[in-house]
């Protein structure tokens, strides 16, 4: 099931998302480890409780929870700690291909990781997706992009060896609730204490990224 186009109605800004990998570790009799990365790409997790600050927020959350029927339906959320792509290379022309996947590359001295971005905003200007081929900006009339896959389509194929670059001012993460029940009583106590009191347990309303077939 593809993520519905509607977005989570509250702002999950505090702390941002938590990327999580899955690794199998086998420990031998001598204590040596064999590690295997089960997932090459992480799943991002959020705690929606951080978005609840008022009783009106609780009402909005409950209404949305009913609309998506708990864990059944997916939706979009903005990761305020990581929601944009600065101009970077996404591919190289071969004279034939006209489609290129929007990606975000994270680079350190240790290595790099390419994250596939599937849910960019629709705009095709500085507020959304921009594209360059061989260091020349591609006019919006000569390209398009999908807000459900992140695939950029050019009207003409870049010449062999020409670098294709892109930027994205804002993208979303497809998620679902990871619970089928919300503790409204604990949420109310959280709000009454100021939604930040150090002596009050933070409610847990987990959201987890979803992957769809063929992604």
Predicted segments, located by residue:
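Secondary-structure transition/turn motif
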Residues: 52, 104-107, 153-160, 211
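Extended beta-strand solenoid/passenger and fiber regions
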Residues: 62-142, 169-215
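Generic detector of short, aliphatic-rich beta-strand segments that form the cores of beta-sheets
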Residues: 162-168
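Beta-strand-rich interaction surfaces with strong enrichment in secreted/lumenal proteins
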Residues: 35-36, 89, 154-156
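A surface-exposed beta-strand-loop module
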Residues: 136-162
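Generic structural microfeature
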Residues: 43, 97, 126, 159-160
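A generic structural signal for beta-strand entry/edge sites
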Residues: 45, 97-99, 147-151
């Amino acid at each position: 099931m593809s993520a519905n186009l509607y977005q989570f109605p509250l702002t999950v800004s505090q702390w941002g998302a938590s990327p999580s990998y899955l690794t199998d570790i086998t420990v031998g009799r001598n204590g040596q480890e064999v590690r295997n990365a089960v997932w090459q790409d992480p799943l991002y997790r959020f705690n929606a409780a951080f978005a609840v600050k008022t009783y009106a927020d609780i009402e909005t959350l409950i209404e949305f929870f009913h609309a998506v029927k708990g864990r059944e339906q997916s939706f979009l959320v903005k990761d305020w700690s990581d929601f944009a792509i600065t101009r970077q290379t996404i591919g190289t022309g071969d004279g034939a291909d006209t489609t290129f996947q929007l990606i975000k590359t994270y680079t350190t001295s240790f290595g790099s990781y390419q994250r596939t971005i599937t849910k960019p905003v629709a705009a095709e200007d500085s507020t959304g997706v921009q594209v360059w081929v061989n260091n020349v900006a591609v006019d919006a009339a000569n390209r398009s992009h999908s807000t459900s896959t992140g695939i950029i389509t050019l009207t003409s194929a870049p010449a062999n060896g020409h670098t294709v670059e892109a930027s994205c001012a804002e993208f979303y993460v497809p998620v679902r609730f990871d619970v089928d029940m919300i503790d409204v009583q604990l949420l109310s106590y959280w709000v009454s204490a100021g939604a930040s009191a150090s002596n009050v347990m933070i409610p847990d309303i987990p959201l987890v990224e979803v992957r769809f077939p063929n992604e």
